[in-house]
């Protein structure tokens, strides 16, 4: 579903970045830690990227010399903290446009998304519902601090106008091309790999994992045009059979920025283009310090330990143990700094009951222990982190 890249957008960054700056960003953020060479090459003078298009097979972007000023006047739509107008005794987030992206969809779609968790008949939590509630409370707090706040999703309905049925033909072709010429239409009564190899499962995945995120990307990039996006999620450990889920003893926090692209991912021309657009527009120079400050605040408020990635699809971004670089569709498509939050494990027993309590102020008794609202802690962690970052980095 990726768009055909407009390579002239990269060419507009000619002379904006030195080879040393490009190489550092590539090696420390955007590549896998011990990855293979990328499907593009750079010399002392320029970057050369295969486009995958017959009319123009390569895109060439000259580097600027180390001691020369930038020769590009290309400016992104978003603003760094240092580029915001002086505060002049106004609220600390004045002029800052924040988009809040509540993860997943929730509501009647939660079971399809596999973001529905219930340990007892008549009770459940749904990540899409929780993330939307968190976003609405967070918006109120941020507006009080002067921010302009837009919600990417405002209800328990999809942003995309497409539905799973729109992807049945494409899903059937995917399965046929993968060596399954007669895939089952429905996964009714199926589990495990057998369920994954059905037209229904593949169609649903294209709907909520791909089409929905592309629709949100269009809204962010074409309509909202914020200075920063906060993607609000709740994490989970494997809970086994959804009809008989298991609690996990683990509870943790991590924050994601964009990066850590595998050579295989970069073989796709749209992914290659989107990664280079982020790199050349220097999104990481704002995204990583902002994410780090928010992560530090979230850690203080929630008192959660850092999640530890053991897979090669993520790498630490900087020295903060809570912040990782990972290539996700949302943090790649949104053309501005994106802070992607993953606090709390929904199937951790205490967290599950805290989340069932929705949002409350103060403390309440859960499992014989006085606890705060997980959603209130989530909101407070973000607000304090944003205040710290922008009060430190914007003109006074």
Residue ranges and their predicted role:
Residues 136-147, 221-225, 234, 295-304, ...:
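Sec-exported extracytoplasmic/periplasmic mature domains
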Residues 84-219, 238, 248-252, 259, ...:
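Active-site histidine-acidic residue metal-binding/catalytic motifs
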């Amino acid at each position: 579903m990726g768009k055909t890249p407009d390579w002239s957008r990269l060419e507009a960054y000619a002379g904006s970045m030195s080879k040393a700056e490009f190489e550092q960003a590539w090696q420390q953020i955007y590549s896998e830690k011990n990855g293979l060479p990328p499907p593009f090459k750079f010399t002392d003078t320029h970057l050369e990227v295969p486009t995958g298009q017959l009319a123009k097979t390569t895109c060439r972007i000259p580097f600027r010399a180390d001691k020369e000023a930038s020769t590009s006047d290309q400016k992104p739509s978003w603003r760094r903290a240092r580029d915001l107008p002086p505060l002049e005794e106004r609220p600390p987030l004045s002029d800052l446009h924040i988009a809040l992206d509540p993860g997943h969809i929730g509501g009647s779609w939660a079971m399809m998304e596999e973001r529905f968790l219930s340990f007892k008949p008549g009770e459940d939590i749904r990540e899409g519902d929780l993330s939307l509630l968190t976003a609405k409370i967070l918006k109120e707090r941020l507006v009080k601090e002067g921010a302009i706040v837009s919600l990417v999703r405002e209800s328990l309905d999809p942003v995309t106008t497409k539905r799973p049925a729109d992807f049945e033909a494409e899903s059937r072709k995917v399965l046929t091309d993968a060596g399954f010429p007669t895939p089952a239409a429905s996964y009714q009564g199926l589990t495990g790999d057998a369920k994954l190899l059905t037209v229904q499962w593949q169609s649903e995945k294209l709907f909520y994992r791909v089409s929905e995120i592309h629709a949100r990307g269009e809204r962010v990039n074409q309509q909202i045009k914020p200075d920063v996006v906060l993607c609000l999620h709740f994490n989970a450990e494997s809970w086994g059979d959804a009809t008989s889920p298991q609690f996990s003893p683990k509870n943790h926090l991590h924050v994601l920025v964009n990066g850590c692209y595998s050579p295989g991912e970069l073989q796709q021309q749209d992914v290659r283009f989107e990664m280079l657009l982020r790199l050349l527009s220097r999104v990481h120079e704002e995204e990583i310090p902002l994410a780090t400050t928010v992560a530090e605040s979230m850690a203080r408020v929630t008192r959660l330990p850092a999640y530890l990635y053991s897979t090669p699809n993520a790498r630490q971004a900087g020295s903060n143990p809570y912040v990782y670089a990972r290539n996700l569709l949302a943090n790649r498509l949104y053309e501005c700094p994106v802070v992607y939050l993953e606090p709390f494990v929904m199937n951790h027993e205490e967290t599950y009951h805290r989340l069932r309590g929705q949002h409350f102020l103060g403390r309440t008794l859960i499992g014989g222990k006085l606890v705060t609202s997980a959603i209130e802690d989530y909101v407070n962690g973000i607000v304090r982190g944003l205040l710290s970052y922008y009060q430190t980095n914007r003109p006074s």
